[in-house]
């Protein structure tokens, strides 16, 4: 099966996809000072804890449990030259703030990076209210939006770094 597996496949460790994404975000932020992280009071839970420890305020913004505000603030920051990564559970972003994503980010083609964490069915004790299956369909329907779904932590790490350089709106789905 030569050529089908990555050269380092034996060295891959079991790591949460969002942890890999969070590490990639830190690497991207070290090279790109305009990268900022926003969340709806979920910084640690969505994998941004390492970013928060290294950069803190003003590059780390907790907007409260207000996902509509989360993406609207991110859009405003992008309009001023920042590269915002706005994260929440996928059930709430894009689940609760789809209209704001459409209007303030996509129609204006702002380079906001939306991170939908805890996507899918495996959300533990949180149950059906936190499950999100429709996020890819919702986000693919938006103009200018790039939709990404990494397969493992290493891919997620590289994806975060690539997203920081992309000048389009992005959505990444993290399990």
Task: Give short role names for the model-derived ranges.
Residues 1-174:
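Thiamine diphosphate
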């Amino acid at each position: 099966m030569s050529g089908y597996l990555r050269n380092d496949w034996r060295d891959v460790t079991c790591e949460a996809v969002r942890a890999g994404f969070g590490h990639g975000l830190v690497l991207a932020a070290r090279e790109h000072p305009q990268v900022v992280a926003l969340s709806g009071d979920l910084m640690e839970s969505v994998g941004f804890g390492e970013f928060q420890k290294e950069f803190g305020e003003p590059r780390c913004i907790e907007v409260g449990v207000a996902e509509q505000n989360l993406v609207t603030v991110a859009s405003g920051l992008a309009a001023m030259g920042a590269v915002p990564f706005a994260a929440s559970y996928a059930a709430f972003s894009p689940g609760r703030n789809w209209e704001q994503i459409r209007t303030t980010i996509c129609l204006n083609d702002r380079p906001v990076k939306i991170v939908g964490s805890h996507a899918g069915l495996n959300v533990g004790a949180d149950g059906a209210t936190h499950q999100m299956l429709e996020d890819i369909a919702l986000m693919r329907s938006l103009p200018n939006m790039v939709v990404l779904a990494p397969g493992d932590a290493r891919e997620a790490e590289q994806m975060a770094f690539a997203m920081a350089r992309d000048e389009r709106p992005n959505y990444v789905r993290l399990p």
